[in-house]
Regions:
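Glycine-rich adenosine-cofactor-binding loop
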Residues: 3-29, 39, 158-170
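Residue-level detector of alpha-helix initiation sites
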Residues: 18-20, 83-84, 131
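NAD(P)-binding Rossmann-fold cofactor-contacting core
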Residues: 23, 31-49
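Short acidic/histidine-rich motifs immediately flanking catalytic phosphotransfer sites
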Residues: 53, 71-75
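Conserved SAM/SAH-binding loop
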Residues: 60-65
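ADP-ribose/adenylate-binding Rossmann-like module
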Residues: 75-82, 86-113
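An accessory alpha-helical subdomain
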Residues: 129-227
Length: 227
């Protein structure tokens, strides 16, 4: 079972800045979480993310894990090239009552790390072999990515971008979840809105949503589909 853990605003600690560590950090960058990296060495990619203020980095040789106790992370990931150290990192996470992950030992970890198809940091599709074969998971991801990038259209991505705007508006005056859901589905059928989303005119799309919303909530009125 694949679970999408909600990490927004939470602290995730990654220990180890090699290839595996950077792979995990790239995935975390899409989650709008706080990323704290500890590694013995830096590299150009780490320096770039630090300069962009996407991660916090501390150059540190790990000999004792007690320094972690001053933090309150939701997750600690051991991504070093030392299997025993990664296991200790996982156990430290358990002692601190947070999720733990050891990169080369997924069977003892709280979760396996799936191979992700990431489309414009909006849609993520996970492919997992439950830690049994990362090579095959990567193979499937590469093949599936070509298909999904054809299936998921530009207007679909733009609809996701403005979805929160429409949903927040709906919550102000549409009283029940079922009615709000009905309103949200109705937006997908509006030709003017679809054209705005297709051409990337998100400002015009929001204006159109406001018009449709006003029609929907008009006292004693009936939603007028002006397609």
């Amino acid at each position: 079972m694949i679970i999408d853990l909600y990490l927004k605003g939470e602290l995730v600690i990654v220990i180890g800045g090699g290839d595996e560590g950077m792979l995990k950090i790239r995935s975390l960058l899409t989650q709008d979480c706080k990323i704290l990296l500890f590694s013995e060495e830096s590299n150009k990619e780490i320096e770039k993310y630090v300069k962009q203020k996407k991660i916090t980095f501390e150059k540190k040789k790990i000999s004792n894990l007690d320094f972690l106790e001053k933090y309150k992370p939701i997750m600690i990931m051991g991504t070093t090239d030392d299997k025993e150290l990664n296991r200790k990192i996982y156990q430290k996470a358990k002692d601190m009552n947070c999720h733990g992950y050891a990169v080369d030992d997924p069977m003892i970890s709280d979760f396996s790390h799936p191979s992700l198809i990431n489309i414009e940091n909006i849609v993520q599709i996970a492919i997992s072999t439950q830690g049994k074969s990362t090579i095959m998971a990567k193979k499937f991801r590469i093949e599936a990515e070509k298909i999904f990038k054809k299936v998921i259209k530009k207007e679909d991505l733009n609809y996701i971008r403005i979805h929160e705007y429409a949903r927040s508006m709906a919550k102000t005056k549409i009283p029940t979840p079922n009615e709000r859901r009905e309103f949200m589905y109705s937006l997908m059928d509006d030709k003017n809105l679809k054209q705005n989303l297709k051409t990337g005119k998100l400002g015009d799309a929001k204006t159109r949503i406001k018009v449709l919303f006003d029609l929907w909530v008009k006292p004693y009125g009936v939603y007028a589909n002006s397609n």
